[in-house]
């Protein structure tokens, strides 16, 4: 054996809440970013999602995600809406599923002009990490840097709480990835090396993932509760 490589979907995989100012714009960009990193997106919060502030706060508390991706606003644009979203997260004071004594990882990938205010709101209550804006201008997404941060925090905050993780790390020759993220990388590698468009399906125990690479653009979507173990009844329904 030349190398041992491991992926993980333990504990239901990487579960995230994402947020954006406009649901159909930065909200969808944040969702694509998290999905492409191998996460299950539990909810998309947005300033215009029709929910009242207390409903958004209660929803964050209820879900207890592994981490939150906070996005919104183009660079140089208004800061008030994304800071408002940060305040909802701070008011919820959410605790991660694993490691109750740890702070919840929050990734900020929104308007760079709002960074100082987001730090003021979330810096003490969460394990806040800042990265490049996932949508710096309306016409362009920039998902790569935030996806890499998600991978890093998955190892540092989520997998580190899993029983046996340290022992498993001694065996592996590469960092442990979320299983959907690893499958996505396989699809992108095939598309790049063969110079073709690729569509792939990964049928798991609880969810089914669809991957595509068209014109070098990668996308992943998740059909929740469609799988081959305890959600098999939904497939057959």
Give residue spans per PLM region:
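Nucleotide/phosphate-binding catalytic cleft detector across ATP-hydrolyzing
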Residues: 1-197
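Glycine-rich phosphate-binding loop of actin/hexokinase-like ATP-binding domains
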Residues: 188-237
